[in-house]
């Protein structure tokens, strides 16, 4: 029963890591990355469709994304969706593909993005701490119901804290790496 609590907490913390990685992928670092377009949805035959489902996204150069629609008739819709997105990148339509040239980041933009990364990282740590609190509460409930002894509770709390510390360290590492990537010129 005690292992189930730890496993559930680990699983939820892993989901937090994956969510953080997705969020970091959407923060542009001055170089082309297909995950920049993950949040772009295109109105395609009346249905909001993720861009990566109706077009291939390639990276021919370090700061260029090439969007090639599977259906050429959707080119205008894709261009409209890219213009409406908050990417800050102007699409160039040449009739068959759309080029997105990622502008070099200014020093001020880099600092702003680094602040955003810290904020997102901090939110992920708060989520992990909430998971820890839930796991601790569950362990205390089991001890109250006499399913585990007081000694087992203490051991379980230590194990939960260790899992939490590992998760927070992983988040700190991810945040530091993303900040370093952003501040590189």
Swiss-Prot record:
Record InterPro entries: Ribosome_recyc_fac (IPR002661), Ribosome_recyc_fac_dom (IPR023584), RRF_sf (IPR036191)
SUPFAM superfamilies membership: Ribosome recycling factor, RRF (SSF55194)
Cell compartments where the protein resides: Cytoplasm
UniProt xrefs under CDD domains: RRF (cd00520)
Pfam family, any one: RRF
PANTHER family noted in UniProt: MITOCHONDRIAL RIBOSOME RECYCLING FACTOR PSEUDO 1, RIBOSOME RECYCLING FACTOR
Similarity-based family: Belongs to the RRF family.
Function: Responsible for the release of ribosomes from messenger RNA at the termination of protein biosynthesis. May increase the efficiency of translation by recycling ribosomes from one round of translation to another.
Protein name per Swiss-Prot or TrEMBL: Ribosome-recycling factor
């Amino acid at each position: 029963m005690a292992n189930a609590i730890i496993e559930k907490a680990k699983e939820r913390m892993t989901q937090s890591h994956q969510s953080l990685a997705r969020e970091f992928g959407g923060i542009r670092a001055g170089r082309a990355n297909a995950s920049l377009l993950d949040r772009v949805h295109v109105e395609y035959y009346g249905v909001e469709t993720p861009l990566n489902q109706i077009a291939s996204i390639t990276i021919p150069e370090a700061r260029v994304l090439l969007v090639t629609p599977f259906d050429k008739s959707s080119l205008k819709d894709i261009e409209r969706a890219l213009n409406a997105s908050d990417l800050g990148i102007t699409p160039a339509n040449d009739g068959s593909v759309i080029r997105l040239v990622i502008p070099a980041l200014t020093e001020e933009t880099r600092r702003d993005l680094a602040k955003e990364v810290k904020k997102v990282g901090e939110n992920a740590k708060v989520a992990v701490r909430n998971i820890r609190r839930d796991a601790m509460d569950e362990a205390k409930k089991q001890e109250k119901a006499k399913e585990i002894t007081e000694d087992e509770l203490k051991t379980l709390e230590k194990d939960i804290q260790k899992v939490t510390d590992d998760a927070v360290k992983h988040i700190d590492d991810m945040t530091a790496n993303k900040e370093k990537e952003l501040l590189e010129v």
